[in-house]
């Protein structure tokens, strides 16, 4: 079994829980997810099965879309609703224009510091392990891409009686939405936290494409595997090169290929090689031999 499943991860489960349950449902060990979703977050979680696990990093690298509920006037230890209250501040009126000005400032390339309650590693230990022990450590900042921030629930003024708003976030990999909520609050002069989150898109998979674990289980029991998307779906944005049988034979042996073969994709960081409409391998420019390209992954799906 090879392919990608757009799973709808339900609230209360870890991403690893989903992988564990799918291994049982699908009767296969080769199952991998494409980027962790916190347990209290629900949403699109593409799962790679069989040879598709070789593509997990490329699927993870694609953009994401979230719908978040952000609450102003209160910050928490975890930057979301699960944490203890750190600070509160009564809200004066915040107009739609003031909020939009803050959102505009946070669109584009921004720098974030990961929250203490996160899986980022510092000195070989996950940040949440330090946080649970009550230890605050210096966290490395990271640059992330925010493509768009769109308020969803109208233009009502925010105040003490109406402290929350919904926001659609289109962003690149590695963005912490919790931290974004705090940053929006800071620009407005208030403590803030992310009170709810749903991932509505991951890469090329949307909410409406997804199935729950129960639905996949039901289909498997009916011997229906139509929930599997082909591997090619995971590399839709990657440059592609159709190869002939002679090149294909070299690719199967992991051979180096001449740069001249890649003229139409020469400015790309990598290219997917397609034979008989199937993904065969992913190649990239050789780091030392300027006239050659080398295999990054050999997929061999055509032999499955």
From Swiss-Prot:
Enzyme class at the top of the EC tree: isomerase
Q: Which Pfam families match?
A: TruB_C_2, TruB_N
Superkingdom of the source species = Bacteria
Q: Which Cys pairs does UniProt list as disulfide-bonded?
A: none
Name the UniProt key words of this record, in alphabetical order. Answer: Isomerase, tRNA processing
SUPFAM superfamilies attached here? Pseudouridine synthase (SSF55120)
Report the active site residues.
Answer: 38 (nucleophile)
Q: What is its EC number?
A: 5.4.99.25
GO BP annotation list: mRNA pseudouridine synthesis; tRNA pseudouridine synthesis
**Molecular function (GO) terms listed?**
RNA binding; tRNA pseudouridine(55) synthase activity
Which chemical reaction does it catalyze?
uridine(55) in tRNA = pseudouridine(55) in tRNA
- The answer on whether this UniProt entry bears the keyword tRNA processing reads yes
- Identify the Gene3D superfamilies for this entry: Pseudouridine synthase (3.30.2350.10)
Briefly state the protein's biological role: Responsible for synthesis of pseudouridine from uracil-55 in the psi GC loop of transfer RNAs.
> Record's family?
Belongs to the pseudouridine synthase TruB family. Type 1 subfamily.
UniProt-recorded name of the protein: tRNA pseudouridine synthase B
Question: Which organism was this protein described from?
Answer: Listeria monocytogenes serotype 4b (strain F2365)
Q: What is the lineage of its organism?
A: Bacteria, Bacillati, Bacillota, Bacilli, Bacillales
């Amino acid at each position: 079994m090879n392919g990608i499943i757009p799973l709808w991860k339900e609230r209360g489960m870890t991403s690893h829980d989903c992988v564990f349950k799918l291994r049982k449902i699908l009767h296969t060990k080769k199952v991998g997810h494409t980027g962790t979703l916190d347990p209290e977050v629900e949403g699109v979680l593409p799962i790679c099965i069989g040879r598709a696990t070789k593509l997990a990093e490329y699927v993870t690298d694609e953009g994401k879309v979230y719908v978040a509920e952000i609450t102003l006037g209160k910050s928490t230890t975890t930057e979301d609703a699960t944490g203890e209250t750190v600070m509160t501040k009564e809200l004066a009126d915040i107009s739609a224009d003031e909020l939009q000005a803050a959102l505009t400032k946070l669109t584009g390339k921004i720098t974030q510091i990961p929250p203490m309650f996160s899986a980022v590693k510092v000195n070989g230990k996950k940040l949440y392990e330090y946080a649970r022990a009550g230890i605050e450590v210096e966290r490395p900042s990271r640059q992330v891409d925010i493509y768009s921030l769109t308020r969803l629930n109208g233009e009502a003024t925010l105040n003490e009686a109406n402290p929350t708003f919904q926001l659609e976030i289109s962003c690149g990999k590695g963005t912490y939405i919790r931290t974004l909520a705090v940053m929006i609050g800071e620009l407005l002069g208030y403590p803030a936290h992310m009170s709810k989150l749903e991932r509505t898109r991951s890469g090329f998979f949307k909410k409406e494409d997804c199935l729950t674990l129960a639905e996949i289980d039901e289909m498997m029991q009916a011997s229906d595997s139509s929930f599997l998307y082909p591997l090619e779906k995971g590399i839709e944005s990657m440059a592609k090169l159709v190869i002939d049988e002679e090149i294909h034979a070299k690719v199967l042996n992991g051979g180096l290929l001449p740069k001249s073969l890649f003229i139409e994709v020469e400015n790309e960081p990598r290219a997917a090689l397609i034979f008989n409409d199937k993904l065969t391998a992913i190649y990239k420019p050789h780091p030392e031999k300027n006239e050659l390209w080398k295999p990054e992954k050999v997929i061999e799906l055509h032999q499955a």
